Amino acid sequence: MAEPAPFTSMFTAMGTPDLVLDADSVPTPGEPGATGTSNYRINSTDDIICYDITLPGVTPPFQSPARTATHIHEGAVGQAGPPRLAFPNPEGSGDPLTSEGCTQGPITTGTGSTLDRIEADPAAFFTDSHAATFTAGALCGQLTAMPEGGVETGAGGTSDSGWAPAAFRGTRGVLVGVWTAAVVS
């Protein structure tokens, strides 16, 4: 489906193997060296979520009893929880594996699951990907709200100071990094 405009909210999650929990909320090792960035853009008015998921260091095959092995779960920091949204598993011919696109509800995973619940309390949700050798999760990361257009890092300056900020955007225009670069005249 085509990406809508505008979005009502944006979220990011930085996944690491040390944040993985089993179903009883016990810390469980994820895949060593795995990292991940998941960026989500929500239009809760039209019940649409768009996603850009990048997983360097995750070894397929993916495996989960759910429809796919890449999810947003409901669970605060340190708490396991049920999957609420399933996304296509990342793919690729090498490293990193990626998945991107948009999907429209209604959400059918869990009772009462709506995108506006994520908007109301993003810290109550995390994202993860499950692999055959790491069934509890290869990695996991808590959702964090991002203002549309990115975040002010405080880095940078003016051309008079010799330094200026430079923003880098990934696929679909999502801010993926801000660097400060010297201005050379």
Which role does the model predict for each range below?
Residues 1-70, 74-184:
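Metal-centered catalytic cores of metalloenzymes
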